[in-house]
């Protein structure tokens, strides 16, 4: 897009997480921004110092260079706003004035950004921008257990909602939770599926079945109470030795909230020698390596709205065993490689692990597409701006749910 074309095009600004506190939302913010940039002028305004470092569960790796992706030159970026504002907020407002977005899309996942989003949304809305709030979950579950945080979000969120013209969620599960939690008035709420994390993993070539090699199972993600990793270890431990020796289990991810039960379960497992544990947040290059080694991925969550690692596994085309909870049911509904199991059920999980032996080397097409995701966003944006959506946008928007 030339400078002249960019000046006359629809301009969408995505506001979300930056790389200083790298997370799945950092990658989503990046990927949505770059996908939108293929259709319109797009920019990104990032949160930099998300919270005081001492308060962050992954404090030891804050600021580390963990990613190998960067925003392209045609996507202007401000990186970014600090939790305590200072000059960073003044510069963010200047960035909004310079870019003059027609639409801003706020990525919501934590109450830590609420005071900042309230300021940015009010500023952008008063300058004529339409505001879309994209909900990844109502509030981080660990954060919600901290004294006063649930009340803080519940008190200030209605103020933010005054400036929001439309909402986006990733599943009917999230739609139900959102409409039960807040009065949204007549603002449209669109279900738009999570786009693929195809910048982190590519479809892996099918491997020929080799019964002499162990099947490599991968759990990758932060280890927290709701992730259910201890259930995976329990399921693996219930296999007899002849069964277990046919696998290698890789558990990769840093521990949050002091949740050591999975590591304790590994230590007492009769198959501990078959389990590799990597207790840190790995780089993008390492992540690609683990998914490249894996024959299958396992996600034993107790609850979840969405899962970045699950999206990566589907982008890689791997067989996945995933618990049928929350938004994961819809995320995997059209993925032929998914084997859903009930949560908190190591016996069912163990049976699913054994079924993977018959799917060794299989690869599957990821049903998710950024083209469809962007079509749905464009349809919603046209609606907010009082324009008629394109035929493609209307078609893909109709695949979701619109609640008014």
Model-derived regions, located:
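Acidic anion/phosphate-binding donor-loop and adjacent secondary structure
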Residues: 179-180, 190-214, 387-388
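Conserved donor-binding/catalytic core segment of Leloir-type glycosyltransferases
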Residues: 209-227, 233-236, 250
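N-terminal strand-loop element at the rim of the active site
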Residues: 16-22, 34-98, 254-258
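Nucleotide-activated donor-binding/catalytic signature segment of Leloir-type glycosyltransferases, i.e.
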Residues: 262-285
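Conserved acidic donor-binding segment of nucleotide-sugar-dependent glycosyltransferases
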Residues: 334-347, 354-358
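Membrane-proximal helix-turn-helix segments that form the acceptor-binding/catalytic region
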Residues: 122, 126, 139, 149-167
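A short, active-site helix/loop in glycosyltransferases that binds the activated sugar's phosphate group
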Residues: 161-189, 196-198
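Acidic donor-binding loop of glycosyltransferase active sites
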Residues: 289-305, 318
